Amino acid sequence: MKILLISGHGAGDPGAVSQFGKEADETIYMVKEIKKTLSAYAQVDLYPTERNAYKDAKAGKLAVDFGNYGYVLEVHFNSGAADLKGNGRTTGTEIYVTTAEKTVGVETKIVQSIAALGFKNRGVKKTNFTVIYRAKAAGVSSALLEVCFIDDKDDMSVYTAKKTQIAAAVANAIATQFGLKKGSQEAGSSPATQEIKAGSIVTIKSGAVYGGLSSTRGKAVPAAVRRQKTHGRQGTDK
């Protein structure tokens, strides 16, 4: 199986910024760490981290062919909590799929696994964000992960202490839900196939089958965040 990981923002766009970090930097860190674990189960590619996939999608100049992948995960950090002093509780983690996705087993497992490390689970939501919309339009299941809130002291305290564990949790959640086996295929090889004959009984792993479309996103960042995140919903500019 081939999986594409995309770090949100970059190429001059820092994303959300607070005293605890810059989104564009943390998304690059996360995709690289997720790849370290996930590469034991599948071929994992990174969208060029010096580029901005959202800007590329809007300009019609994406650096990859989504059709070459079995799953696409775009990584971001959320904002809007404006809890810079900390209130003793996290605002949490959430993940988005397009409105066309039929099942969300992979995404449910991802946020459950992150939440188990100390975050509130904000669940799986459906919004057509630009990059994942383009991936789904190419027939590929996709999701946009908001790891945690970059302007929440409690969130970022947990994240800073457990960032490598969070990345591993995301990778293992994907591998588990797709039924991937460690070392089962070499990088660049095709997933193992099995002939299905008439009358055969086929079991499909929950969460491993999808169908739909995807899009972009846009949201205003509070005063606590110095620069505005950019990714409008499909068909909008923000």
Label each PLM-derived region with a short phrase:
Residues 2-93, 98-99:
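Catalytic-core regions of hydrolytic enzymes
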Residues 4-6, 15, 65-67, 72-81, ...:
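Active-site-adjacent mobile loop/cap segments within catalytic or ligand-binding domains
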Residues 10-12, 50-54, 77-83, 100-103, ...:
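Solvent-exposed loop/turn segments at secondary-structure junctions
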Residues 14-20, 154-157, 214-217:
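Short acidic, glycine/proline-rich loop/turn micro-motifs
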Residues 29-39, 103-118, 155-183:
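Long, well-ordered alpha-helical scaffolding segments within enzyme catalytic domains
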Residues 44-50, 121-127, 182-186:
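Surface-exposed patches in mature extracellular/periplasmic domains of secreted proteins
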Residues 188-233:
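Beta-loop motif signature
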